[in-house]
Amino acid sequence: LLRTRYAEPAVRAAAETLIDRLGLGLAGLVNILNPDRIILGGLHRGLLAADPERLRAVVAERSLWGQSGSVPVLPCTLDHDSLVGAAELAWQPVLDDPLAALR
């Protein structure tokens, strides 16, 4: 839908809302984790491809790192969803209980 109908006002408005919210979430993660880069796959890669400047601007604008530069936001180069799923599965315990993962 993003690739074929992004020029339509309703599709574009919905995508921009999603991009802005994704950017806010990523900025929060940047502030907490201080990564050297962000790699987006799946649906998130599609949002990055739809409007990379907007997403990168939101992350830079809302993150502390944005004050001195910005963290690179890059598309995932893995085309196999199973590999991406395996990587997400490895992170699930951290997402479920972040404090326990630090112990």
Q: What are the functions of these language-model segments?
A:
Residues 1-103:
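ATP-binding/phosphotransfer module of carbohydrate and carboxylate kinases, centering on a glycine-rich
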